[in-house]
């Protein structure tokens, strides 16, 4: 287990890649967020540390490894529909998810410019019924098993962006 908010996270990922003998797919599923209408600064900064700095630390490490080894690779990340349509009750969460969307788009452009065979899949689910939102009253929560199947399908089909919420999938 790697704590992506720690400075050694990049080194730990590289060690894991070495132990496995390489990497074809980096799958990023890490994030935190709260409804924070009072703008509790600790919650806002923890969200930025995990969803912003931690995200960059890990995704950039995976990208650099794939680029440096000239391997065909695939970087798939669970972001959120909140990056597409901001949620006023969760400003840091929505903002960091938008950052993730753009960061992946930029790395995808860079890979094409450098003629690197690295694919990207930005997975944007809506509200998934998980422990992260347990006890809160989010509308139309998505079944976690169905979302998991949609994620696997998006990765296997090498989709660039996969919105998993019928309300936003236009």
Give the predicted meaning of each segment.
Residues 29-35:
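Conserved NAD(P)H cofactor-binding loop of Rossmann-fold oxidoreductase domains
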Residues 85-91, 136:
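Active-site loop immediately N-terminal to the catalytic Tyr-X3-Lys motif
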Residues 59, 96:
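Active-site helix of classical SDR
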Residues 1-8:
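Rossmann-fold cofactor-recognition segment
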Residues 122, 134-169:
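C-terminal helical subdomain
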Residues 36-49:
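Short alpha-helical oligomerization interface
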Residues 80:
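Residue(s) in the substrate-gating loop at a strand-loop-helix junction
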């Amino acid at each position: 287990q790697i704590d992506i908010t720690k400075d050694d996270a990049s080194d730990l990922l590289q060690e894991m890649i070495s132990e496995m003998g390489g990497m074809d797919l980096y799958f990023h599923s890490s994030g935190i967020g709260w409804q924070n209408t009072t703008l509790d600064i600790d919650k806002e900064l923890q969200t930025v540390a995990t969803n912003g700095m931690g995200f960059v630390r890990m995704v950039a490490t995976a990208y650099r490894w794939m680029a440096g080894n000239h391997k065909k690779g695939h970087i798939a990340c669970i972001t959120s529909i909140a990056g597409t349509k901001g949620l006023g009750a969760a400003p840091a969460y929505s903002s960091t998810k938008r950052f993730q969307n753009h960061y992946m788009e930029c790395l995808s452009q860079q890979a094409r410019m450098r003629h690197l065979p690295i694919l990207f899949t930005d997975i944007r689910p809506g509200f998934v019924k998980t422990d992260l939102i347990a006890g809160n009253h989010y509308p139309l929560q998505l079944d976690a098993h169905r979302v998991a199947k949609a994620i696997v399908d998006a990765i296997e089909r090498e989709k660039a962006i996969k919105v998993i919420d019928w309300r936003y999938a236009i």
